[in-house]
Amino acid sequence: MNIDLSPIDRRKVKNLGEVLEMNNEVLGLMSRYLTVCPDFITKELIEGVTGECEITLAEAYTSLLVAACGLDVENNPRDRYLSTAYLRSGIRRLDPQEYRMNPYYRQIRIPEAHFGNWKLTIEKYKPSEAFVCDDIRTDEELKEIPQIGFFDTEFSFPAVMEDVQEWMAIKPNEIETMRQPIARAAGRVVAFGLGMGYYAFMVSEKPEVKTLTIVERDENVIALFREHILPQFLKKEKIDIVRQDAFEFATNCMSDGYYDHAFVDLWHDVSDGYPLYKQMKALEKNSPNTLFSYWIEDSLLSHLRWELFHRMSDLLSATAPAGEPVILRPVYTYEQFVACLRNPFLRKLAGTGLL
């Protein structure tokens, strides 16, 4: 691969690298906050700020979260930029009623039930507790904006716990990140990963969906779903559950073009999902007539973007190792360089095995 840029374009690439560094910095800040103290902000703190500063509730919440993340917006220009360009545009006050009216929430009643170390239960967000509420948003400058939401009141959601760890749940984040795959689904659909059946329920309700095959290898997940959740489905006759490894099924059972759409949800987050995403992307070529969708794909592509940027930067500075594979066409302008880092190209690259 050849990358040959002008001095001006090289400076632009350097500036782009700083943007990607800030993406990682903001992600780290939010990850630490959500892990250590997601309920630090309280109604009393918010009311204190709104009373003193005469700002809206949402503005007060954002200011408190910015301060809790350790950003000094008064004295540090970089911190001020991170607050303005990332956090203030990504924090949202959500309407709990909008989610309570979701068809799954209205139809499915979750009982308290145990399967070995697994427990089907109801968990809660506290008032003003912060949580991830959607996939990251990537703008034209390749800034990646985390989407953080909060409710004014307590919000309950169904979950499966394994001992004390939340294993799966139907929260606003799951609802938002599955909107597009659900909207795309039509004809004969296959879903890799069962979870608590949110995707299955929403897709089965669509008149344009004829059948839904769910591929799941965990017998406990299947048993929990069959006993407590599937009986409440209104269109359960559309659903067939296959206990099998997802990659075996994708390799051996999809080459005939039977499925119109596939949805892949085999991971908990980006850390365990990235290699699985690339593995399934590599199998898409076996099913050219099937449209694939992937849960939290934009976040997975963020990981790939970072990896590719460093590979391209090494090539630009002539520090790439010998035998570097050709993964791109020649790049002679900054615009061509950036195009390789945008999602459309990254989706094509993900399944090639070249990175």
Question: Which ranges hold each PLM region?
Answer:
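N-terminal auxiliary segments of SAM/dcSAM-dependent transferases
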Residues: 1-151
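Class I SAM-dependent methyltransferase Rossmann-like catalytic core
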Residues: 2, 89, 93-101, 157-184
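SAM cofactor-binding core of SAM-dependent methyltransferases
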Residues: 168-233, 244
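A short acidic, amphipathic alpha-helical/loop segment
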Residues: 202-203, 252-254, 276-282
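Short, conserved loop/helix-junction motifs that constitute active-site signature segments
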Residues: 206-207, 256, 283-288
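Conserved beta-strand segments of alpha/beta enzyme cores
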Residues: 211, 238-240, 291
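S-adenosyl-L-methionine
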Residues: 218-261, 269
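C-terminal substrate-binding/active-site "lid" region of AdoMet-derived donor-dependent transferases
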Residues: 268-355
